[in-house]
A protein has these predicted regions:
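Conserved acyl-CoA
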Residues: 64-79
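C-terminal structural segments of small proteins and small subunits
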Residues: 75-108
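Residue-level recognition of the GNAT/N-acetyltransferase active site
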Residues: 53
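Aromatic side chains
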Residues: 24, 38, 47, 56, ...
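N-terminal first-folded block
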Residues: 2-50
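Conserved acetyl-CoA pyrophosphate-binding loop and the N-cap/start of the following alpha-helix
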Residues: 56, 60-65
């Protein structure tokens, strides 16, 4: 996925930040399919937990959600702390996102 906008939409799939709920959400045909929760503070976004509803698993929606969230963090100039194992695993598998994690924190996250 390329740089994030306010919402990314592809044939019935939409991803957007829901700051009032402190999470990014992915919807399929208008139905909430998953989310990744975060906390922000002083130029940092910490990803805490990611969930994709069982009925939507196996479609790559989690990866799309996290790519969008990380692209948005980059656009906003936020450093990333991947406390969520899914986000951490995504970054390990997509090294072009490692630079979002402060160098001093990479060892703690096995990056």
């Amino acid at each position: 996925m390329t740089a994030a906008s306010n919402a990314a939409e592809t044939i019935g799939v939409a991803v957007a930040d829901a700051p009032e709920r402190e999470r990014y959400e992915i919807h399929v045909d208008g139905e909430l399919a998953g989310f990744t929760e975060y906390k922000t503070r002083r130029g940092i976004i910490a990803f805490i937990h990611t969930e994709v509803d069982e009925g939507f698993q196996g479609r790559g929606l989690g990866d799309r959600l996290i790519a969008y969230a990380l692209d948005d963090a980059r656009k906003r100039g936020l450093a990333v702390l991947p406390f969520c194992p899914f986000v951490r695993s995504f970054i390990q598998s997509h090294p072009d996102y490692v630079d979002l994690v402060p160098e001093s924190q990479r060892g703690a996250f096995e990056l």
